[in-house]
């Protein structure tokens, strides 16, 4: 069957060192996985606990470590709660961005940053 997800808890959302250690421990517990998916639920929540510069530095290191190992990292941010400039800087450290919006009651998405995917808004069912 499928392996159990590795869940590590930290004492505080501001504990960036603890998050980094938990990531390393989770990967180490799995041996050398050829496929790993890292989900970072909310950059916006992180920013309630640490300043933008620390958050950016942490996310940059985490995304580089994830990418260097050949893993997939998925990070979410609510762009409506941050300045456009900050959102653009943060998303620049990732390979691509998936944007979601609601238009006339329909949900749409677009992918930016992948050369083989056109950056046009596309409806998707929910």
Residue ranges and their predicted role:
Residues 2-61:
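Phosphate-binding/switch loop-helix module in NTP-utilizing enzymes
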Residues 55-57, 63, 90, 126:
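General N-terminal targeting signals
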Residues 16-19, 52-55, 75-79, 88-91:
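A short linear-motif detector with a strong N-terminal bias
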Residues 45-46, 68-72, 82-84, 97:
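N-terminal start-of-chain detector that recognizes signal peptides
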């Amino acid at each position: 069957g499928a392996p159990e997800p590795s869940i590590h808890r930290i004492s505080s959302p501001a504990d960036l060192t603890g998050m980094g250690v938990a990531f390393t421990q989770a990967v180490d517990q799995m041996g050398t996985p050829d496929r790993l998916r890292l989900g970072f639920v909310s950059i916006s929540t992180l920013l309630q606990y640490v300043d933008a510069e620390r958050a950016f530095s942490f996310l940059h290191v985490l995304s580089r470590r994830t990418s260097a190992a050949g893993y997939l990292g998925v990070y979410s941010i609510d762009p409506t709660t941050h300045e456009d400039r900050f959102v653009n800087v943060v998303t620049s450290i990732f390979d691509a961005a998936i944007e979601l919006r609601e238009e006339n009651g329909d949900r749409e998405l677009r992918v930016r940053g992948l050369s083989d995917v056109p950056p046009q808004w596309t409806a998707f069912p929910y």
